[in-house]
């Protein structure tokens, strides 16, 4: 089995703008098949910044944000299902579109808005210029085997870069910072010092 180099080409807005991988296998009928996400990508420590949000996507998110904060806000929470004997399922592996959709739809709580937004995000995905970056996020997330939801995982991975955020898009910065201001009190800290 012969592997060629995993190549990265950078640009001004992100360290990784394009990802190309060439795998060469011997021409046997039983040649091994290897997907990109099965490779050991632990050497990729610097994920690219979240791509600049396109004007179409900004408008879409603004519309759904307005719907979610308006009249429909009474139906925000779905009824809770009984989880008495809940079996832990193996997490579904993400692809680039699932990562993209998960990141941009996470702040919409209304179920009907979520469903419609998901369909509209599928259309936006077809026009997305940075599909490879979202695919890279998904590959790294799958490889990490994290128990965190994708959006939270991405936020944690990119939190080191928040201080030196270079994107010219304040919407993206705001998306990352939405949950970064939550303070959790450690109630066990005092108890452990007493014993």
UniProtKB/Swiss-Prot annotation:
Subcellular location: Nucleus
GO molecular function terms attached to this record: DNA binding, bending; sequence-specific DNA binding
DNA-binding region: 89-145
GO biological process, one term: positive regulation of mating-type specific transcription, DNA-templated
PROSITE patterns: ALPHA_BOX (PS51325)
Residues forming coiled coils: none
Keywords: DNA-binding, Nucleus, Transcription, Transcription regulation
Anything else known: In P.angusta, all mating-type proteins (MATA1, MATALPHA1 and MATALPHA2) are encoded on one idiomorph, consistent with the fact that P.angusta is a homothallic haploid in which any strain can mate with any other strain.
Family: Belongs to the MATALPHA1 family.
Primary role: Mating type proteins are sequence specific DNA-binding proteins that act as master switches in yeast differentiation by controlling gene expression in a cell type-specific fashion.
Protein name: Mating-type protein ALPHA1
Organism: Pichia angusta
């Amino acid at each position: 089995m012969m592997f060629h180099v995993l190549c990265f080409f950078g640009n001004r807005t992100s360290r990784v703008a394009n990802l190309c991988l060439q795998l060469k296998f011997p021409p046997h009928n039983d040649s091994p098949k290897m997907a990109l996400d099965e490779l050991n990508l632990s050497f990729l420590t610097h994920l690219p910044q979240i791509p600049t949000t396109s004007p179409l996507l900004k408008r879409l998110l603004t519309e759904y944000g307005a719907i979610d904060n308006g009249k429909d806000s009474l139906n925000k929470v779905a009824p809770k299902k009984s989880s008495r004997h809940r079996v832990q399922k193996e997490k579904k592996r993400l692809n680039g579109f699932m990562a993209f959709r998960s990141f941009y739809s996470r702040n919409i709580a209304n179920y009907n808005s979520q469903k419609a937004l998901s369909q509209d995000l599928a259309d936006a995905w077809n026009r997305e210029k940075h599909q490879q970056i979202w695919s890279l996020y998904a590959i790294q997330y799958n490889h990490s085997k994290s128990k965190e939801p994708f959006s939270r995982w991405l936020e944690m991975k990119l939190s080191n870069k928040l201080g030196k955020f270079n994107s010219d898009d304040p919407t993206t910065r705001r998306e990352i910072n939405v949950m970064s201001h939550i303070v959790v009190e450690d109630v066990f800290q005092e108890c452990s010092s007493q014993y």
